[in-house]
Amino acid sequence: MSTRGVATRKNRYFDSVFLMAVARRLSEQRGVETAAAVMGSPANKKILIDMGFSGQALDLAGPNDLVVALEGDENAIRAVTENLEEWLARPKSELAGGMAISLDDALSRQASSNLAVISVPGQYAAREAHAALDHGMNVFLFSDHVAVEDEVALKRKAVDSGLIVMGPDCGTALIGGTGVGFANVVRRGPIGVVAASGTGLQEFSCLVHRSDSGISYGLGTGSRDLSDAVGGLSTLTAIDALEKDPETAVIGILSKPPGESTLRTITERLNRCSKPAVACFLGLVADSLDGDARFEVCATLDDAVAAALRLAGTDASEIPASPADQSAILAKGEAERMAAGQMYVRGLFAGGTFCYQTQQVMRRSEIIVHSNAPLDGMRFLGDPQTSIGNTLIDMGSDEFTVGTPHPMIDASQRAKRIAAEADDPQVAVLLLDFILGYNASADPAGDLANAISNAKQVASEAGRHLSVVASVCGTDGDPQDLAQQEQTLRDAGAIVFASNVRASSFVRDIVLQRAEVTG
Amino acid sequence: MATLRSLMEDGPIAINLGLVEFAKALRDQKKPAIHVDWSPPPPADQEMQDILDELL
């Protein structure tokens, strides 16, 4: 008979990635059925209570306290809780090269520090970022849930000091060939990028690399920078820097649509920029710029890459390895193999920008989709756990990541959702993104290969043909090996494309075919 | 005292607070990165800090 136990440690902080690894190792112990290791935030405690855990230790745990919850054989649980410290010890190799006890201690060891990389919980992030700026460092602020007034204060302070705050909610930067955060191994080249979206910058830089060109600098700004509340403070700083940078020949700007007045500010700034520029404001209605722009405005990341390459005058090869020219024929072939009633796409995305961009591809063909992050004109998916018709889900959004790592690191939620979608006889095609590079999962394709092949098999046994379409954002230099990742997906039965736009266009063709067949 | 320009010219010389993986990835790219063993301020300190922030 199984039992439940909860152990806590007061004022012991561990990050969610480390705790995920602890929970995974615990759950592999003989006799342990369920294991969770989280900080005792209200949201995490609610998840544990919903899982059936209870008791005084859990009730008293606060956000600064560690909570380990276990279900299974009584002896197994006792063995873990009596030796909890051993389970919480970090491998010594992780700390090779020195660890400081504070920002001041770190600065005393490395006085030339020029960048603070901050990923602490959001409520503490602004204070740490202010301290870094006060010490004369630029800031890469990965943390989210930072108040917008804190963001504005930080960015104003940075402007006054000739520094930049990349973030909050900044996933990626490329600083002269070095990736910060979630970044790919990309060669240096003539194209400089300013990006409000981490995955947008990753996709753009990978496609530039795969076209034999390169990136001078990719400066993140955080997802809210071009809102009217923030006014593009970091974007303007980054444009100034890239305009002065001798290595940069072309400047690309990637973002969701800016606020109205910020769009005017950015348009005016790019119009007087001495270097050619390309803007991709995903989801922007075309006439919002009123013909004012004296720079290229592109609807998709792929179009922006093509424009930037052309403006840079590079002799770039076309983005390789996609059966694009045969795409429509292949889509028709896939659609013809499907059973009556198979009509819809279910897109399960690790990258929020990909969820957004796929909706844009669908909107152009007047295909209505439901999403937890809907583009203008699309429908809001009230319960993100339950798909309706065509559904595209950003699985990196808050409702999926409270208490668990991002799907770029941990594929378990996507694996479960793939299985659920495969059981739905109305589903024609699954659309998935795979993001390689530093700090992503060591094997993103391998993490979901079984889920993909099982989904296809379940559908097949029910007399259906389920298409699985994937895009892989990565380069040949990435630690995960792009070619191997693509092959793993093909072996699992997926059709693989080199970009999200190409995969989305293929899926759109299938959906249109199925709508035609089923009337 | 760094600037954005010096970051771009010298490359990242980083101090990392939070996910240790970010420091490890920089070191994998042969860039200096010191990881800070960060933990949240105790709740009492937090309240006091908020009061000080208000006053200052």
Residue spans for each PLM region:
Chain A
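Catalytic-core regions of core metabolic enzymes
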Residues: 2-519
